[in-house]
């Protein structure tokens, strides 16, 4: 049987007989002696096969090739001084092989090199198609090991220090669509009826609070049928938590200690506490985003009142229609950003327009401190307005001022996107920085112009601020999101626990009494049986691991992810099923393949 893992061996084991299992990372023949790097999930160790010492093992080593699965028995020896490898944890030792047994060979050409010694860049589609090979590589091995350490740190903190208990909630549940589309599962036993895969354990964890389990957590699988991007997956993992009898401040404090524990345990990083806070209004005003990246400046400045009566209709018209005019100041932007990049066809212009802006206006601050204006802005900006713009933006000579004008939503989205683009483009972001913050005081609801109704900004179970109960359409929510380097890693709230308030919220978002009863009657009924005050939070575990590993894509934090087309390239899921299977489920497909036009 195995005595050690490859990556465990150190100088202390010199003279020890060992049995190792693993994969051939690479094989080298040097002057009649064969060297093999043997790899398992803990690392690699060098195997030596010398024909003068062990002819049999040498003969076996001659037949080894990359990725063969082998069992090796031998003795640990110290490396000669000239062969020490300080880059490897096992670099002080090597194993003189007495016996090599090939457990399995590679019978096809490898689609890419797996060896840790090979830094080959491999196309992502190929990596996902042969994911079992990709997971053998150092990068993905490290990522999944770190993911395991994160989960272990979470469990130890919540259970050992905070008395949480882990409870599993159903995966087959009821469809209550309020956000993304549900993944639906037909019931064979109950024809014509459907389960839904949970978008979160939200309702069940609230019911656990009603049940008296006052500190619950779960590493939960969740499912959302939504458009994908680099940091989203159709199935994902949450750290889900719920607590009774705690205030918002107490929940935030507990979660700061949890996050600090994770970073200390997994990365050895001491996080300063308390984390900074911004209200939703402050975040949107200063950054145009409710998940701002605060590793760099470039804060937005609202000048709507300054240009409201300006003759330039793009600005004044935006303000009169209820929108905004904001400036994104770029220090030293005159030297670093040309006009071509801001005008149609330029990369900065493209960033703004792809976020919905019609374009970008701009002015430059000359070296003498005066504003250099162009076109319609030049003809319509008074000296007083110029002076006020300089005062508010605190623009120094050489500063470029980019304007966004239009609806508040479009201005915020477009300038936020330009800000993020320039933060990277101008090298303003410290890649080692970890900027955590809370965003609080979100609106309870937002207006959906297409459907002509209010929608819950988070979800309809979020408790309104007690001071704002008179009008829920303008109420602040007792909600809190935690943001790391511009990405939301978690979000939560205090929950409604009184039936009358919950029914008012349902009414505010356009649910009739009958609809609310049909969808959430079981929850409303539970509120009649002594529901405690409670609140919670959920973290995107995949996204948190992505940030901790420094990866750009959430797919590199997951063992077997889907593509951005929601496909598994390894198993070729989703796939057709037989007519017999559909018939058993009383399901018929109405989908028809598109008709190809003839040439």
Swiss-Prot record:
The family this protein is said to belong to: Belongs to the class-II aminoacyl-tRNA synthetase family. Type 1 subfamily.
Protein's name in the database: Aspartate--tRNA(Asp/Asn) ligase
Superkingdom to which the source organism belongs: Bacteria
UniProt KW keywords: Aminoacyl-tRNA synthetase, ATP-binding, Cytoplasm, Ligase, Nucleotide-binding, Protein biosynthesis
Single biological process term from Gene Ontology: aspartyl-tRNA aminoacylation
Organism: Synechococcus elongatus (strain ATCC 33912 / PCC 7942 / FACHB-805)
Site entry (Important for tRNA non-discrimination), positions: 30
Reaction(s) the record says it catalyses: tRNA(Asx) + L-aspartate + ATP = L-aspartyl-tRNA(Asx) + AMP + diphosphate
């Amino acid at each position: 049987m195995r005595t050690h893992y490859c990556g465990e061996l150190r100088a202390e084991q010199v003279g020890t007989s060992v049995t190792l299992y693993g994969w051939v990372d690479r094989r080298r023949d040097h002057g009649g002696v064969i060297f093999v790097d043997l790899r398992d999930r803990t690392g690699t160790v060098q195997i030596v096969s010398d024909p003068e010492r062990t002819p049999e093992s040498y003969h076996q080593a001659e037949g080894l090739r990359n990725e063969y699965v082998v069992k090796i028995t031998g003795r640990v020896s110290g490396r000669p001084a000239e062969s020490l490898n300080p880059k490897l944890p096992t670099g002080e030792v090597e194993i003189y092989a007495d016996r090599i047994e090939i457990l399995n060979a590679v019978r096809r050409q490898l689609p890419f090199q797996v060896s840790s010694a090979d830094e080959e860049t491999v196309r992502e589609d190929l990596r996902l198609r042969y994911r079992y090979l990709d997971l053998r590589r150092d990068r993905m091995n490290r990522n999944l090991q770190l993911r395991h350490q994160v989960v272990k740190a979470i469990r130890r903190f919540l259970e050992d220090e905070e008395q949480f208990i882990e409870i599993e909630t159903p995966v087959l549940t009821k469809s209550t669509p309020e956000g993304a589309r549900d993944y639906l599962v037909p019931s064979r036993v109950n024809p014509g009826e459907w389960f839904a895969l949970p978008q979160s354990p939200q309702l069940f964890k609230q019911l656990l609070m009603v049940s008296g389990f006052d500190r619950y957590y779960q590493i939960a699988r969740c499912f959302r049928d939504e458009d994908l991007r680099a940091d989203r997956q159709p199935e994902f993992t949450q750290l889900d938590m719920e607590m009774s009898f705690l205030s918002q401040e107490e929940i935030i404090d507990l979660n700061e200690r949890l996050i600090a524990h994770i970073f200390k345990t997994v990365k050895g990083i001491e996080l300063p506490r308390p984390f900074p806070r911004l209200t939703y209004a402050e975040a949107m005003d200063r950054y145009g985003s409710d998940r701002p990246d605060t590793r760099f400046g470039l804060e937005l400045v609202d000048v709507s009142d300054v240009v409201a009566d300006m003759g330039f209709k793009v600005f004044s018209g935006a303000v009169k229609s209820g929108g905004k005019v904001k400036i994104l100041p770029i220090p030293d932007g005159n030297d670093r950003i040309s006009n071509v990049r801001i005008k149609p066809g330029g990369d900065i212009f493209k960033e703004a327009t792809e976020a919905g802006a019609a374009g970008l206006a701009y002015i430059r601050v000359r070296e003498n401190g005066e504003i250099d204006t162009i076109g319609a802005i030049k003809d319509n900006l008074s000296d007083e307005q110029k002076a006020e713009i300089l005062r508010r933006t605190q623009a120094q000579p050489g500063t470029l001022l980019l304007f966004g004008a239009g609806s508040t939503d479009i201005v915020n989205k477009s300038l936020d996107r330009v800000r993020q683009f320039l933060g990277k483009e101008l090298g303003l972001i410290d890649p080692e920085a970890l900027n955590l913050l809370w965003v609080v005081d979100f609106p309870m609801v937002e207006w959906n112009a297409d459907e002509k109704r209010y929608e819950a900004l988070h979800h309809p179970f979020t408790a309104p601020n007690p001071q704002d109960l008179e009008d829920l359409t303008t109420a602040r929510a007792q909600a809190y999101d935690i943001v790391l380097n511009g990405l939301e890693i978690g979000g939560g709230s205090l929950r409604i626990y009184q039936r009358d308030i919950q029914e008012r919220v349902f009414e505010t978002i356009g649910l009739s009494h009958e609809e609310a009863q049909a969808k959430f009657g079981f929850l409303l009924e539970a509120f009649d049986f002594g529901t405690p005050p409670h609140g919670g939070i959920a973290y995107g575990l995949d996204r948190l691991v992505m940030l901790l590993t420094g990866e750009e894509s959430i797919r590199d934090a997951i063992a077997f992810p889907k593509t951005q087309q929601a496909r598994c390239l390894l198993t070729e899921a989703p796939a057709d099923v037989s007519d017999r299977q559909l018939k058993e489920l009383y399901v018929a497909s109405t989908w028809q393949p598109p008709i190809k036009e003839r040439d």
